[in-house]
From Swiss-Prot:
One of its GO terms (biological process) is negative regulation of cellular respiration. Residues 28-324 form the Deacetylase sirtuin-type domain. The gene is SIR5. It holds the Pfam family SIR2. Its EC number is 2.3.1.-, 2.3.1.286. It catalyses: N(6)-acetyl-L-lysyl-[protein] + NAD(+) + H2O = 2''-O-acetyl-ADP-D-ribose + nicotinamide + L-lysyl-[protein]; N(6)-(2E)-butenoyl-L-lysyl-[protein] + H2O = (2E)-2-butenoate + L-lysyl-[protein]. NAD-dependent protein-lysine deacylase that decrotonylates the PDC (pyruvate dehydrogenase complex) subunit LAT1 at 'Lys-148' to inhibit PDC activity and consequently ATP production. Also decrotonylates histone H3 crotonylated at 'Lys-18' (H3K18cr), to repress the expression of genes involved in aerobic respiration. May also act as a NAD-dependent deacetylase. Does not mediate desuccinylation, demalonylation, or deglutarylation of LAT1. GO terms for cellular component: chromosome; cytosol; mitochondrion; nucleus. This is NAD-dependent protein deacylase SIR5. It comes from the Eukaryota. Its main location: mitochondrion.
């Protein structure tokens, strides 16, 4: 299955009159943001699936590259996440990804990461699918066998030509030519690399490391770019998990669910009987409310703030000192 670009919001298909009518209909029902009702649903749920997006890590200080914040040096961030962009200018693409690696290496998991890790420890029938490539879920102690990194990892390195792969590369910068993307600045001061008005010295392809195995291909970030296939073995494992039994509850966290095939898991979970709970700042916006079906939940909150509260009946009070102890 290939990673597809974000689809237009389905709400654009409907007229404003229809959207308003749908909103009135759902408002008349039991509150979609009733924490007590969600707690009851959580307590009665055995098999739980989660789909996480960039919003999960936003409170850790990582940019989501969505909406108004979707530009990097005046480049649409999604336009840099393609193999064709890498072939056209590997230095520019690597600067973008080295910057992201640098930011992730300095970020720390937030309470939402820890809450999901705690849920995994308490419930062995919980499976988390993350679209994030930042490694923060792993840092929070999320059990590896209950975590699927759909889009790979910034800290894996692949070859553009052969099957060579290196896992767990934390070099910062990745290579000397990328040092401008690994600069630390004082809080409140601008990062020079992000100032599009400042000229950017081009990076020669000769400065990008070649594959140590085939000696032909370039080393590239081990993430899934738009148009590329997701890991087939991982995808088959997720399908098998879905087929094993009914799904009681699905958490959709920090994502507007516009990128496929990941977004398709929401419909698959519904077909297996799952109630859907969306935790995302835009979840209660009028243009999103048409998605909230009877019995489902929508919490227009930041995951770091709200997820520990929502999961509290199962995980208990989240320890505030976990960060210092980890």
């Amino acid at each position: 299955m290939r990673l597809l670009r974000p689809t237009p919001r389905l709400s654009s298909i409907f007229s404003s009159k229809t959207a308003t009518s749908n909103l009135r209909f759902f408002t008349a029902m039991a509150p979609h943001n009733d924490v007590g009702a969600f707690h009851e649903a959580l307590r009665s749920s055995k098999r739980i699936l989660a789909l996480c997006g960039a919003g999960l890590s936003a409170s850790s200080g990582l940019p989501t590259f969505r909406g108004a914040g979707g530009l990097w040096r005046n480049h649409d961030a999604t336009s840099l996440a393609t193999l064709s962009a890498f072939k056209n200018d590997p230095g520019l693409v690597w600067l973008f990804y080295n910057y992201r690696r640098h930011m992730c290496l300095r970020a720390e998991p937030n309470p939402a990461h820890y809450a999901l890790a705690a849920l995994a420890e308490k419930n062995k029938d919980f499976l988390c699918l993350t679209q994030n490539v930042d490694n923060l879920s792993q840092q929070a102690g999320h059990p590896q066998d209950q975590l699927r990194t759909l889009h790979g990892s910034l800290f894996d390195i692949k070859c553009t030509n052969c099957d060579w792969i290196q896992r767990g590369n934390y070099d910062d910068p990745f290579c000397p030519a990328l040092a401008p993307a690994s600069v630390d600045v004082e809080p409140g001061k601008p990062f020079p690399l992000l100032d599009a008005s400042l000229p950017l010295d081009p990076i020669s392809p000769d400065d990008i490391p070649k594959c140590p195995q085939c000696k032909i291909g370039f080393q590239r970030p081990g993430v899934v770019w738009f148009g590329e296939n997701l890991d087939e073995v991982m995808m088959m494992g997720i399908t098998n998990w879905l087929l094993e039994d009914k799904v009681d509850l699905m958490l959709v966290i920090g994502t507007s669910a516009q990128v496929y095939p990941a977004a398709g898991y929401i419909d698959k979970a519904k077909r297996k009987g799952a109630r859907i709970a969306v935790i995302n700042p835009e979840a209660e916006n009028e243009e999103e409310m048409y998605k909230v079906k009877p019995g489902d939940f929508a919490f227009g909150k930041d995951a770091a703030e709200y997820l520990p509260l929502l999961l509290e009946p199962v995980i208990g009070k989240l320890e505030t000192d976990k960060k210092e102890r980890s």
